[in-house]
């Protein structure tokens, strides 16, 4: 035991972060340990030259240790993108030029899947946001006004800062509640990647401003919580802290568009997720993508989490979307469908986000597909249902979570796929928000 030291210092955490690379399934020089009689696990630093797995095995022999695990690393769940073409006008600056006021031209994912009262085009893979928006206006909570959604991700481009960062032009300053950066250990969870801004935009980007596109729950407030670094990777201990920050600061929905490696149990995150469930917070996670992952994994398989797979514009399963235990629902992730799909429609999920390599220049790239994008739709849907007359607003605690989950499942559209691929089916937010 002399080779181990309990460590909560920023210096040690930074050291662990700086050497996390794509070849690592866990942070080197660090363990997550929970001792008997203690409420929460600790980060434990290891002496130089100490092997992580060997140290974990040694600690597990101590009867005072409830668990000792590597500090596993999660990665953002975006499928491999198409190359970003700066000369393609479809990927560029409408967000900055203010020319794209009509979201329906690009956001097939929000259209209805069949003819209805709207004059808008239909999309086989759409989730009928228009009917949901009408239901919320009638309920006096347009766009899920008043609901707070925590986005645990690479950060969000939510404010201007020292000339280095800019707020996304389709976000308003009043859309955000205070967040935190558990990577940089400060109160500025700004995005250096683009993934988190894209996810946040799908959940709650502004509408009716003649600029950019729109978000599903466009009047919800966002809580940016940075738990992934500029490369889209984050440690279990900081993710658990991010979940608890969202609980303490009264989020009602938590979005987690990232995954740990296959078959890894991550008890420190599971414990935080159980606390979120008891607090009445709906937790949503991507199931992961083929290539970057090999099986549905945590947090999608965590306690009471809604695991979300990705569907395409043609209402097929995305060719990247993993199948297995933990798939609860499908939502639009865009991209190329799996083999056997009768539709060739394969557009991505369009949203305003950072240009590659920039923290202050924005575009609408045609590069984002995957279950990360799908999870964002379900988080937005949960916010809409919470604000609607489809459920009792007086619900609290675990009962609220169970009702929201049941409502989303019971109104989902069966795509005729195995449950291991589609769960209950493709979300239909129009039906999910119909008044009781």
Could you describe each region identified by the protein language model?
Residues 12-91, 131-134, 139-140, 272, ...:
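Inhibitory N-terminal propeptides of secreted protease zymogens
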Residues 60-147, 156, 160-170, 180:
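Protease zymogen maturation seam
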Residues 63-66, 145-148, 219-223, 248-254, ...:
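Loop/turn elements at helix/coil->beta-strand transitions in domains of secreted/extracellular proteins
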Residues 77, 183-184, 189, 210-214, ...:
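Substrate-binding/specificity loop regions of serine endopeptidase catalytic domains
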Residues 132-135, 152-171, 186, 198-219, ...:
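Flexible, small-residue-rich helix->loop connector segments that border functional cores
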Residues 145-148, 152, 160, 186-226, ...:
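Active-site alpha-helical elements of protease catalytic centers
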Residues 200-203, 223-229, 252-255, 335-422, ...:
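Hydrolase catalytic cores
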Residues 238, 242, 247-258, 265-268, ...:
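C-terminal subdomain of the subtilisin-like protease fold in secreted/lumenal serine endopeptidases
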